[in-house]
Regions:
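Substrate/ligand-engaging "lid" and interaction regions
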Residues: 1-447
Length: 447
């Protein structure tokens, strides 16, 4: 049975109809409505396509009402939490319903714009109907109506996403030669950069869907599944009190408002992504297929803990309690029995990932401690072993290079791959050589 939502004004315009925003931003809006008196709805815009997709039509047919299911491990125990969400007003198709989308920009109640249009969505392409051009058109309509500016919270996974969106929008406005509009955007609109952190699986598997239908008394085709963990970092300009308008903390959301989000980005990349990248090749060669299997294995569980708490921990410039809580949450997230994170999927493009996610930690550790982090350094040996197999999924150039069977030192000297000559790091080549000389038999074969 579809529940009728309480009439509330539209306060959020959302570009992107996918599962992530519905399980992240829209879930937060529901929490603010329930716990913090936000009193607002989200109007979703499907930014691409000639017509609404079947999932968008299904959500509209339900009056915007759907459920979230948060599944994972909390305090060492598996949990499965079903929640109602009444925060979505409706979904519009940008191409087929642009007049209605533009009318939304003229709503006096509107204050926030959120988006997730993929990493390629925030781009300036002259003459093309990109997402930033759509934003520029909406701001033009709002400016002409004499209404206040808007606050932008892009969730695309690019660095400084708010700054990037603002640059693209102003470039389109400059193309139009509208100096008054440009001045209003610069003065009255706020573009906040963000960092989002929650793993969202999307639709449940058929068996789970049947179980949820029995619990709910209906089959919700718009139900979305994610992990319980969530973290939202919003970089705000000096003097702007976003928390006064967006009471996320009051609603119990794990949010940080900060003038500099870089330490939190570093934390996520090094702890969450780096621990993956440093361990996955060895896990694959040991015969494992999913991350949760690795965490359940005593050897790899200890390995993860050494990497997280002994090697990554000192290189992240944040308070000790914040780092420890996040590192512990990473282990719980890795152990999520509902996630089914495939090791081979995570291993995609491992060379470039190792450069970004692991190497900076090694360099910082050496700078701080004067010695190499043993496990992270030895992860390079496992990377080399993995790239000698037929399981590798990387660019044709990288795959071809490793098929030529280069020596470890040759690989380490490839500055185009690593950004520096790894043999110049004191002791690095010797540590890798020692790791490569040791027994390579996969653990599962010995068990």
């Amino acid at each position: 049975m579809v529940t009728t939502m309480t009439e509330r004004p539209v306060r959020v315009l959302q570009f992107g109809e996918g599962n992530f925003l519905r399980c992240f931003i829209d879930w937060m809006v529901q929490r603010m409505n329930d716990r913090a008196g936000f009193d607002g709805l989200v109007r979703i815009v499907q930014p691409i396509g000639d017509a609404l997709t079947p999932p968008s039509r299904a959500l509209n047919a339900r009056g915007g009402f759907y459920h979230t299911c948060l599944r994972g491990v909390v305090d060492g125990r598996p949990v499965e939490i079903l929640e109602e969400n009444h925060a979505v007003e409706k979904v519009l198709c940008a191409k087929a319903q642009w007049d209605e989308v533009e009318a939304g920009a003229r709503l006096p109640s509107l204050r926030f714009v959120v988006s997730n249009t993929t990493e390629a969505g925030i781009e300036y392409r002259a003459g093309e109907d990109t997402f930033p051009r759509k934003v520029a058109l909406l701001l033009k309509a709002r400016f002409a109506s004499g209404l206040p500016g808007l606050v932008f919270l892009p969730c695309e996974l690019i660095e400084h996403n708010g700054d990037a969106l603002k640059r693209c929008v102003l470039q389109y406005v400059a193309d139009w030669g509208d100096d008054a509009l440009a001045a209003w955007i610069a003065r009255d609109c706020v573009f906040c950069s963000t960092l989002v952190d929650r793993i969202v699986a999307g639709r449940p598997d058929p068996e789970s869907a049947d179980r949820y239908a029995a619990r709910l008394g209906e089959r919700d085709d718009a139900l979305v599944c994610g992990e319980p963990f969530h973290f939202f970092v919003v970089e705000t300009p000096p003097g702007f009190d976003l928390e006064a308008e967006l009471p996320l903390r009051k609603a119990g959301v794990n949010v940080v408002y900060t003038p500099d989000m870089q330490p939190y980005r570093t934390r996520k990349v090094r702890f969450l992504n780096g621990a993956h990248t440093a361990t996955i090749p060895e896990g694959i060669l040991a015969g494992f297929t999913e991350v949760a299997e690795l965490v359940a294995d005593p050897h790899f569980n200890a390995h993860f803990k050494k990497i997280l708490f002994e090697e990554i921990f000192p290189t992240v410039d944040l308070p000790e309690d914040e780092k420890r809580a996040y590192a512990e949450s990473v282990l719980e997230r890795f152990a999520n029995p509902f996630a089914h994170h495939k090791l081979l999927s995570i291993a995609l493009n491992s060379v470039s990932k190792w450069k970004v996610r692991v190497l900076p930690t090694i360099l910082d550790y050496v700078r701080l401690k004067g010695t190499l982090p043993e496990n992270l350094t030895r992860s390079f040996a496992w990377l080399l072993r993995f790239y000698r197999t037929d399981k590798v999924n990387d660019s044709p150039e990288v795959v071809a290079y490793f098929k030529s069977n280069p020596s470890p030192d040759d690989v380490m000297r490839r500055t185009d791959l690593w950004g520096l000559d790894l043999t110049a790091i004191p002791g690095f080549a010797a540590c890798v050589a020692d790791a490569l000389a040791q027994e390579q038999t996969p653990r599962r074969a010995r068990a």
